[in-house]
């Protein structure tokens, strides 16, 4: 009887440990899903007036990638086109993203920041972008 209880106890502990560690795997399973958003957030943090040539190469890679979403391509294009602020045409497309996505989404947050970009970003926007990079 003692062996059955001990065996049942060990099995239960192992099962609970497996469930616990599996949830950690699932929590980070889609980490790369937001890789483009994280890259763009990192670029926008460093922009002063316009994106550097190096940043533009990274953004162009996002635009050219088949795995990038339409929203990611629009945001990347808007960042490339920034000359002190987003262009009027890009602002219109960014506003469509903002209006059609969940306000708490990283895509919506990034679109909002790029839409409001003017010679740089505010401290509050920088914190939002750093949060996007951290949570990725």
Task: Tell me the role of every PLM-derived stretch.
Residues 12-14:
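Short, linear, compositionally biased motifs with a strong N-terminal bias
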Residues 16-24:
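C-terminal segment of classical bacterial N-terminal signal peptides
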Residues 1-10:
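Bacterial N-terminal signal peptides that target proteins for export
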Residues 134-136:
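Short, solvent-exposed mixed-charge patches
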Residues 65-68, 100-103:
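Solenoid-like repeat scaffolds
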Residues 25-65:
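Immediate post-signal-peptide N-terminus of mature secreted/exported proteins
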Residues 44, 59-63, 76-82, 94-98, ...:
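Fold-core signature of tandem repeat domains
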Residues 39, 51-58, 74, 78, ...:
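Structural recognition of alpha-solenoid helical scaffolds
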């Amino acid at each position: 009887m003692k062996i059955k209880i001990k065996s049942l106890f060990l099995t239960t502990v192992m099962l609970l440990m497996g469930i616990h560690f599996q949830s950690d795997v699932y929590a980070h399973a889609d980490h790369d899903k937001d890789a483009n958003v994280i890259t763009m957030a990192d670029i926008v943090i460093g922009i002063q007036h316009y994106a550097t040539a190096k940043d533009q190469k990274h953004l162009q890679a996002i635009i050219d990638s088949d795995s990038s979403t339409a929203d990611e391509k629009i945001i990347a294009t808007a960042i490339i086109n920034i000359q002190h602020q987003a262009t009027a045409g890009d602002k219109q497309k960014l506003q469509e993203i903002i209006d059609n996505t969940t306000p708490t989404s990283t895509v919506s947050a990034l679109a909002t920041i790029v839409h409001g970009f003017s010679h740089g970003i505010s401290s509050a926007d920088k914190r939002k972008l750093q949060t996007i990079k951290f949570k990725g």
